[in-house]
UniProtKB/Swiss-Prot annotation:
The keyword Magnesium applies. The active site is at 135 (for atpase activity). This is Terminase, large subunit. Its cofactor is Mn(2+); Mg(2+). It is an enzyme of class 3 (hydrolase). One of its GO terms (biological process) is viral DNA genome packaging. Residues 232-422 are annotated as: Nuclease activity and binding to the portal protein. The gene is 2.
Amino acid sequence: MKKVRLSEKFTPHFLEVWRTVKAAQHLKYVLKGGRGSAKSTHIAMWIILLMMMMPITFLVIRRVYNTVEQSVFEQLKEAIDMLEVGHLWKVSKSPLRLTYIPRGNSIIFRGGDDVQKIKSIKASKFPVAGMWIEELAEFKTEEEVSVIEKSVLRAELPPGCRYIFFYSYNPPKRKQSWVNKVFNSSFLPANTFVDHSTYLQNPFLSKAFIEEAEEVKRRNELKYRHEYLGEALGSGVVPFENLQIEEGIITDAEVARFDNIRQGLDFGYGPDPLAFVRWHYDKRKNRIYAIDELVDHKVSLKRTADFVRKNKYESARIIADSSEPRSIDALKLEHGINRIEGAKKGPDSVEHGERWLDELDAIVIDPLRTPNIAREFENIDYQTDKNGDPIPRLEDKDNHTIDATRYAFERDMKKGGVSLWG
């Protein structure tokens, strides 16, 4: 029996990822990146190996079924050849199926455009425990994918089996795309492993591919960064290059010493959440530190006041959205939050506030303390005009903690020579 050295089949980068996969510490393995990184090639090989290791059925999905045969089906056939195990596999085209002959378990294929067919899959002998969604960004919402996941995650598996989900995609350019918001975050679920790869980590590429990549880099660097490096550039300009987002970057000891407090409140109604934020401002270092947050939908004024009092935040001034004067009055008169006042908005106050934040030396955020602040500051992008060119104003969605932060630092913006009245 011929032995195949995986170190000769995998790139060094993906050999390390394969070791992580084999360690079985995660449910979800998300591989994203630019063109030529070979992420899909490696997932296909891993699926072949896992099918030979475990008595499971593997489900492979594209958003639209009629794209399956010429993409993932061919990719998996190629993986069988690359691993030199073609004699152990049966290829069927009607329906599309790859069967591991010694055991009889199969790789099956479906389209996300017919979820009922996914829900109705029955594989009593070999449970559907593996799944690969290729071109994940083709799905319009995270909820679409969640429905499919729940269709697979059913009963407890027999010994020797485990659930394992692969996802692969090239990041869309828009930062607000759901896949970018979910998987570019500093705050990932413990069951999810995310890897980003580029063609620069693939030693098996042709000289022609590399020359083409370098030519694109020379002609259009933004296109190169998006297509070949897999960067979600959004408008092409990063709103906050001064972000420092890292788990544990703000310690309890530091929070205990923070004494230059700024607090802001953006009222939420309907689909918009309420956002209360608490920051420390280090004027000497020109940095701000996110300390705490309350971000949720349908938060009553009583709950807001209870949160402020419970955490002993009422002694510091709160600057709130002035478009809700009745809510401000109610917090003050009915709920005893006396140090609250409305923000003084002007025609250019939004742009001035965003510019002030951008000119800080650092915006320091610990996603374990303030996950919503981290998510919004990471994912926000500039608005664009009809030609797709960025304009100096942030998108007016998923920006509630950012708005609350602008309110919190209103007085500092005026003192720094930036007028909220323009």
